[in-house]
């Protein structure tokens, strides 16, 4: 399996279990030399698995390497020496966990391993701090940091507000911070709130799953950028000039209206965060959403963007680049090879239409067959379905009442 990611948008599509998350895990490892969700373990011998990877880096030139799996130690060895610097890397997992790699904080020389390889957050650690069960924190967590930033009224909260505005589901449903407040007798922390479109301030911990995921992404992006700037200043180095987002099921928990906006928002989020226009964003996202693909039609450029299909062919998983063309709407994407649906309808409606189309091709259909298929259509299609015009004309041409 070989994939040559494009420089901006990369969608991974395919049925469940064919390897989208596998590719995201492997991409994270190639960029950071760490595993976000545990080591990928290959098949049993006699196979001799290896991962070959290459990418451009901040300094001139391209980095390339090959790692061969060592079965005795169950590791994928890396080349010795300084690891390359791909830029900031953020990996959003579908269960609400996140991983962050920062070249200013996780970039080590020789065998100096006092610094963490990366920051791996379980879902509860995003909110409660990392590590959650120790008093000394690498990250205070969303609840504490948000309240502190808001009280401080400094650049971090200004950045958070801009990022939330950029990632909001629509102009009519902005993600506006409310007033932090205590929400439980057993927890004296002041919890962040959001002002809902209906005017009520709702604690973030009680918000919907979709809002919590996007707010978590916004928080970690600001936390990463703030800590990166401070660390880069201490090291006497310029800040990173690139960010890579790896996102598993980018549409998870999001209403279709939000699905339609999320990818353009992520591409523009660094401008909202930094106020600068020249920080490139690369997105590698797994998706099952035709709305997500339809949302980028006006931006898609085959020189910088790609859709990668994973298909099962003859018992093997095959990866290929989808030949890009505008489909026009989400239904057309559903019936493309990316999703492989014959019809964007219920199974019963699809079967009824299949039978009807077969009958339309028949030279001498029987009255009984026409009546039987007509009953199936009436049971499955809506009264205003566009297929009724064709079916009604077919029945009239044969002088049959149906």
Report each predicted region and the residues it spans.
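Short polybasic amphipathic segments
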Residues: 46-67, 190-198, 305-311, 355-358
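Acidic, Mg2+-coordinating catalytic modules of nucleic-acid enzymes
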Residues: 4-9, 298-302, 311-402
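Coupling/switch segment of ABC-type P-loop NTPase heads
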Residues: 71-171, 331-338, 342-344, 348-357
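Extended helical coiled-coil dimerization/tether regions that scaffold
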Residues: 118-244
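Short alpha-helical "patches" and their helix-cap loops
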Residues: 42-47, 230-241, 348-355
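A general structural signal for short secondary-structure junctions and capping/turn motifs
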Residues: 43-45, 78-87, 207, 275-277, ...
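Switch/communication elements of ASCE P-loop NTPase nucleotide-binding domains
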Residues: 1-36, 192-337
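Conserved P-loop NTP-binding catalytic core
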Residues: 6, 13, 24-78, 83
